[in-house]
């Protein structure tokens, strides 16, 4: 069996003296593993770095086998991604999110989103907003999508400022007022009413929002914790927007 696809390197593990097992996110075949012979060579090591875009050819006798990759470089961005904490943690955190999905399960929209985010990790505001949308997309693909288009109580599509922690649906200001202290905030940049640039406060609220539902629907039921890289990314992104902030802490690995 053989196929060819666009891919992004997520990580590698040593295999024997000279080879590695590469983990990649492909556009049409999802997250996939494969053996790369001589993957530890001087020529291949720079190519097989997390965040790099590559072209892979996968071969195996049977579909269920691990198989082998032949890897050709396309965009080698890994060195640039090592320049800032936001980028370093972001690459690790997105890889961990993709590992929540079944192996070999196609998610082409997540592949496309990953490529966009990797090229914006140098800008904390853009990276933070894109990362939140990526987490929302992963939640949706896992079957736990949030409904932020209309008020759960009234059906209104304007002045949506809350999200119900029970239903994961948006709630308008008026309908949610009696329970405001129990609601999650809906960041303006996630509202359907118009374009709003992400800032420190809205990103903080957004990280709390996605962190809450990832913990409730994914991490807690599976008995796992969010990777430290998520908290590292959140802190780096928020600190870049507010350099005077010394420590950032909050529930579910989200920053306040």
From Swiss-Prot:
Key words of the record: DNA damage, DNA recombination, DNA repair
Superkingdom of this protein's organism: Bacteria
InterPro entries in alphabetical order: ARFGAP/RecO, DNA_rep/recomb_RecO_N, NA-bd_OB-fold, RecO, RecO_C
One GO cellular component, as annotated: bacterial nucleoid
DNA repair keyword on record: yes
Any one Gene Ontology BP term: DNA recombination
Family annotation (PANTHER family): DNA REPAIR PROTEIN RECO
Entries under HAMAP family matching the protein: RecO (MF_00201)
Function recorded in the entry: Involved in DNA repair and RecF pathway recombination.
UniProt similarity note: Belongs to the RecO family.
Official protein name in the record: DNA repair protein RecO
Species annotation: Rhizobium johnstonii (strain DSM 114642 / LMG 32736 / 3841) (Rhizobium leguminosarum bv. viciae)
